Amino acid sequence: MTPEQKARKIIDEKLLTSGWTIQDVKRLNPNAAVGVAVREFPTDTGPVDYALFVNGTPVGVIEAKKSEEGENITTVEGQSSRYANSTFKWIKCDYKIRFAYESTDKLTRFTDYNDEKYRSRTVFSFHRPETLASLIRRNDTIRNNMKHFPEFDGTGFRDCQITAIKTLDKSLAENKPRALVQMATGAGKTFTAITAAYRMLKFGKMNRILFLVDTKSLGEQAEREFLAYRPNDDNRSFSEIYGVRRLKSSYIPSDVQVCISTIQRMYSILSGEETDESIDEISLEEVTSMEKKSPKEVVYNEKYPPEFFDCIIVDECHRSIYNVWNQVLEIMDDDGYVSCYCKR
């Protein structure tokens, strides 16, 4: 098997795992499933490695490359763009190729051409067809929404909280989705994080945020603060506007907007393990020993794919426990990743 054949074999496996039906162009039937990936689909500039159809309409392309090209895979983004702007053979309906992937057997990058100043990012796997269909139905992308947040009303907030929130808004608007918020102990870190979550849900139009903690007590504290929070622009409490749930089992409800979980529970959920509340109880001694342990790996979970959460907020991100369960963060294809910790 050549390196390119090996890469395509693994790409096929990832597509199947992500809910796609794969077809050879000779057996073309783009309406066979919600999502159909067609190999070597002809365009007026040559055949694209994979054409992605959602509900019978072409919406994306995949450029498959051998593993050796992984480190330089961004250099083939021009190829993807060329195919995205090409004319697809046999297609009679109006269509737009909005999504592009470049993939090897080890690395996959993704671009949404509807993003302002779009750029590719690494993703754990391909998005599910239903996810792409949902993105197409939206009025705008989350990343575009985050560029146009209204001015923050800091009435009742401390200066350090106002600075943190405004700086975070600026970071997100500049297409920098990963941010670190460092605040002094007692400065209202969780309150600030909840304010950021509220703004991302209301103005960023996010569907779901994951609030990660490393102990049960921090999760309970965060839950209390979410339930009690009242924004300046609404008389209702946070929980009256958005659903909030602290996870206590292996089930994640899809109808809540904020899920609070320990990172060890989230690892178990993604790994398909049954859990109870005891998994959230980690002693100080265990936390201290985390640095000596090998990082834990997670695999694709069909029920909770990488795009399940639009943002991850990590509480006390400096702690050793995140070194061990770091792949829980890496697997998620999130539009925002906010780390918070107190400087003691």
Residue ranges and their predicted role:
Residues 214, 316, 341-342:
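Conserved H-loop
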Residues 86, 298-305, 319-337:
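Short, conserved "post-DEAD/DEAH" coupling segment immediately C-terminal to helicase motif II
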Residues 85-87, 91-92, 97-98, 238-242, ...:
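Phosphate/diphosphate-binding loops
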Residues 1-208, 217-233, 254-258, 264, ...:
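ATP-dependent helicase/translocase motor core
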Residues 196, 246-247, 323-325:
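Short beta-alpha junctions and helix-cap segments that line functional grooves
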Residues 216, 238-249, 263-268:
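Conserved helicase motor
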Residues 262, 315-316:
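Walker B catalytic acidic pair
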Residues 157, 211, 314:
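Conserved SAM-binding loop
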